[in-house]
């Protein structure tokens, strides 16, 4: 069930330029920028940076892009994904 939620709400891609990075994309509806606001204001960006990754916000398209190195532990990745999905759910956003 958890895997289904991940497929629904968060896309995971191998970074074309850098195969050592995993890219997560959270897409919001145009009128809703709640996730990106929350990701900027809470500890997400700090945690992502601590894992050696980066977070960027494409405000016109409503996409929040998170890149994490493959060196991040599976536990850290799972915890971060869990927190992202919980945040999306709590905001009532319908991720695409």
Curated annotation (Swiss-Prot):
Residues bearing glycans: 34
| Cysteines joined through disulfide linkages | none
The question of whether Glycoprotein is a record keyword is answered with yes
Keywords attached to this entry: Glycoprotein
Region annotation (Disordered) ranges: 1-20
Instruction: Tell me if Heme is a UniProt keyword of this record.
Output: no
- Name recorded for this polypeptide: Antigen H4
Biological source species: Toxoplasma gondii
């Amino acid at each position: 069930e958890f895997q289904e939620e991940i497929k629904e709400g968060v896309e995971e891609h191998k970074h074309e330029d850098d195969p050592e990075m995993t890219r997560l994309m959270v897409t919001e509806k145009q009128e809703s920028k709640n996730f990106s606001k929350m990701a900027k204001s809470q500890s997400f960006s700090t945690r992502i940076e601590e894992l050696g990754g980066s977070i960027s916000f494409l405000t016109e398209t409503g996409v929040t892009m998170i890149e994490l190195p493959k060196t991040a532990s599976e536990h850290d990745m799972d915890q971060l994904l869990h927190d992202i999905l919980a945040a999306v759910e709590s905001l009532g956003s319908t991720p695409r």
